[in-house]
């Protein structure tokens, strides 16, 4: 076997520094915290603090954007990846990022930072696919993603359900198969959060109600709540909280 050349001490330090930087930028983070609002001259930014670092989550915006902002007076589960590039609105950017608002009231979550010269909100990014909420494999198969411990449907997920119904009606299909899943999330500190028992049933019941309300016959909705929970890994946990819809001929 051919041996690799021995690196000098200086070269080793340089390589370690480069690899260390790459690992930091690729690091996945998952933590629960109070969200922070940073006021700017244009629109507010949402930030979060973890282990002494401030992270940029996104701008306050409309329901059509992929990022749904947290709420003051509520803790939030932040799941994201540290992105390369300069700080944004005073924080290291997380992209992609998924935020899940916890329903319990916490009055301590009320920090609003004032406008500061040199700290600006980024311009609104061009509209893109709502990857935090919906992924489609063709017109007949769609996966909807959910906030932790929630059956809330965003504008994106509601629109996706409507399109599935249109596909069902246009193709004169026989059924729509619905499977709902309960997820879990591994925090960066090692704690594992498990969604409440029954959340998959709540999600499948809500989707069934919407489908039937849009004209799909009750007998044509084949709905299952999956009881098994995928083990969290701290990387792609947001995608374990889902409902799949498939139009069947």
Question: PLM ranges: what are they?
Answer:
Residues 38-59:
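OB-fold (S1/OB) nucleic-acid-binding surfaces
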Residues 182-249:
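Periplasmic OmpA-like peptidoglycan-binding domain that tethers envelope proteins to the cell wall
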Residues 27-42:
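Structural detector for short beta-strands of small beta-barrel domains
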Residues 38-41, 81-95:
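Single-stranded nucleic-acid-binding OB-fold domains
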Residues 87-175, 189, 233-239, 243, ...:
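Periplasmic peptidoglycan-binding/tethering modules of Gram-negative envelope proteins
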Residues 11-22:
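Bacterial N-terminal signal peptides
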Residues 1-9:
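N-terminal secretory signal peptides that target proteins for export/translocation
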Residues 63-79:
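Short nucleic-acid-contacting surface segments enriched for D/E, G, S/T with interspersed K/R
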């Amino acid at each position: 076997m051919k041996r690799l050349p021995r690196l000098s001490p200086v070269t080793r330090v340089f390589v370690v520094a480069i690899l260390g930087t790459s690992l930091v930028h690729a690091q996945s983070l998952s933590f629960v915290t109070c969200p922070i609002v940073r006021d700017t001259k244009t629109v507010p930014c949402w930030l979060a603090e973890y282990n002494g670092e401030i992270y940029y989550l996104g701008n306050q915006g409309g329901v059509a954007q992929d990022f749904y902002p947290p709420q003051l007076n509520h803790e939030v589960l932040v799941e994201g990846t540290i992105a390369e590039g300069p700080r944004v609105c005073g924080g290291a950017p997380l992209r992609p990022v998924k935020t899940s608002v916890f329903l319990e009231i916490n009055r301590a979550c009320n920090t609003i930072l004032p406008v500061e010269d040199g700290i600006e909100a980024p311009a609104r990014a061009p509209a893109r696919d709502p990857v935090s909420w919906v992924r489609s494999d063709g017109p007949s198969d769609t996966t909807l993603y959910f906030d932790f411990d929630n059956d809330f449907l965003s504008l994106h997920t509601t629109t996706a359900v409507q399109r599935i119904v249109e596909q069902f009606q246009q193709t004169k299909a026989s059924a729509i198969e619905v499977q709902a899943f309960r997820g879990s999330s591994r925090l960066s500190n090692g704690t594992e959060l498990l969604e409440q028992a029954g959340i998959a049933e709540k999600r499948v019941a809500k989707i069934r109600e919407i489908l039937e309300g849009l004209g799909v016959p009750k007998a044509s909705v084949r709905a299952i709540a999956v009881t098994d929970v995928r083990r969290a890994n701290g990387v792609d946990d947001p995608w374990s909280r889902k409902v799949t819809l498939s139009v069947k001929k």
